[in-house]
């Protein structure tokens, strides 16, 4: 069986400064791997390179054993992304947003899928509202719905609960737990929230200054480094 996501020797240099330095890791099927580290450590740059939004200075990204740089269009349905920092089209309704993304990924039974996601993510009351008028928590749930509308085998999460109130953040984490178990999705979660990583991830990569400084289970790393030093 091919590995859903593999990163090999990935580096990114900006103006002679290395933002990411020769990192390698795998995310196996039905596994959630966390990247934990402070702001500026290279988490978002790493995700940007995996998505193809940033061109690596060196190294490669494989999806199911295929180098994504060479087969990006063919691999479109295998990979999706969630981030609170990516804006949704503001003038479309929630339903229109989901229809656009569903058609982009050629989702079968799109109407049923939108109804399912609306129920699971509590979107029924806002389904016909203009996206630009929604609260940050509502936008977060819409972003989550559009990113999983095609049930991608690999999902990248960049600070998925950032700026959410505790109740909404807990709801999103609970949904992700249930969804991942049901679909056996391979997830890479970038966060600086230790509690979030501990709850969701089976293994963690600790990043600092663009490098992976340690990796292992959350239990092992907490014992080794101390919770305070990992937050």
Regions found by a protein language model. Give the residues of each.
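ABC ATPase "signature
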Residues: 215-216
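Conserved ABC ATPase signature
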Residues: 130-134
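Conserved ABC ATPase "signature" region
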Residues: 99, 103-126
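Catalytic Walker B motif of ABC-type/P-loop ATPase nucleotide-binding domains
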Residues: 155-159
């Amino acid at each position: 069986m091919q590995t859903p996501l593999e990163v090999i020797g990935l580096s990114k240099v900006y103006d002679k400064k290395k933002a990411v330095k020769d990192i390698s890791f795998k995310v196996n099927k039905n596994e959630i791997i966390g990247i934990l580290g402070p702001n500026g450590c290279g988490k978002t740059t790493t995700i940007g390179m995996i998505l193809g939004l940033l061109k690596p200075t060196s190294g490669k990204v494989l999806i199911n054993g295929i180098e994504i740089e060479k087969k990006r269009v063919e691999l479109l349905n295998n990979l999706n992304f969630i981030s609170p920092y990516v804006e949704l089209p503001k003038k479309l309704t929630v339903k229109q947003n989901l229809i656009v993304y569903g058609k982009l990924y050629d989702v079968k039974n799109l109407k049923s899928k939108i109804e399912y996601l609306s129920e699971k993510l509590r979107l029924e009351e806002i389904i016909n509202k203009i996206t630009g008028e929604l609260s940050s928590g509502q936008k977060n749930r819409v972003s989550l719905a559009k990113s999983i509308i095609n049930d991608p085998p690999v999902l990248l999460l960049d600070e998925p609960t950032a700026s959410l109130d505790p109740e909404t953040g807990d709801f999103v984490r609970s949904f992700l737990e249930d969804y991942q178990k049901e679909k056996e999705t391979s997830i890479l979660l970038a966060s600086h929230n230790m509690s979030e990583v501990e709850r969701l991830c089976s293994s963690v990569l600790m990043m600092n200054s663009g490098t992976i400084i340690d990796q292992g289970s959350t239990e092992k790393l907490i014992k080794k480094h101390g919770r305070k030093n990992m937050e």
